[in-house]
Amino acid sequence: PRYSSSAASDVYKRQGQTTPGIPAFTWRYAAAFGSSVLRVQRADRNEMTSYWLKDGTRSEPIPVTGAPARSLLDVFSQYLVLGFTHILPFGLDHILFVLGLYLLSTRLEPLLVQVTAFTVAHSITLGLGLYGVIALPASIVEPLIAASIVYIAAENFLTDKLTPWRPYVVFGFGLLHGLGFAGVLHEIGLARSDFVNGLIAFNIGVDLAQIAVIAIAFLATGLWFRHRSWYRARIVHPALTVIGCAGAFWLVERII
C-alpha cells in the first residue's frame, strides 16, 4: 500500500489505502523506541481500536474490513497492563503521592483509610471523565496533581496522626488524579464495545500498582525500621523533602 505519514512529538500517523485482496495487516514499532499504543481507525468506521505493543512486539493480525475479533480476556489483560504501567514505572507523580500517604504513619489503619478514600475517588472521576460527564483541561488538572503532592508532604511534616480532615482531602485529591487517569486512557483510546471491560481493567491495574508501591516501600523501610526511634527523622523526613521538592518543581513546570 501507499501511505502518507506525519510525525509530531511522540505521535506517528499513517493513512492510506491497502492493496486489494489483503485480508489483514500487522504493525511493529522498533524495540529501541520502547512500548507503544497502536490506534487503528477504518475510513468507514468512526470507532477507533487500540492495541498495546510492548517493547517492539508485533501486533496481532488486524482485519482490513470489519471489526477485529478480540476476546474479553484479551481486552481485559491489555488494559490491566496499561493501568499498572501507567503507575509503575511511568507515573512518578502518582507514585510520590501514594508514598506520601504511606509515610504519614507506621500504623495500618491510617493507611487503609487514606488508600480507600483515594481509590474510591479516582475510580469515580476515571469513569465520569472517560464518559465525558466531567471534563477539565490538563492545564488545570496536572498542576493541581502536583499541588496535591506538595500538600501531602507538607502535612506529613506537621503530624503523624490521621487528622479528621485528612480522608476528605485525600478523597478530593483522588478526584483530581482520576481525571488525570481518564485523560491518559482517553489518549490511548477505548472502543465503545470494550468500554466497561477496559475501564474496569485499567482501574484494577492502577490499584494493583498502588498496592505494589506501598508493598515495595514497606519492604524497603517499614518492615525493618518503623519501630526505630529515628525512623521519622532519618527516613520519613528526608523522603518527604524529596517528595515535596519534586511536587513543587512539577507545580511550577506545569503552570509555566
Language-model segments: residues:
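Hydrophobic alpha-helical transmembrane segments in multi-pass membrane proteins
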Residues: 86-256
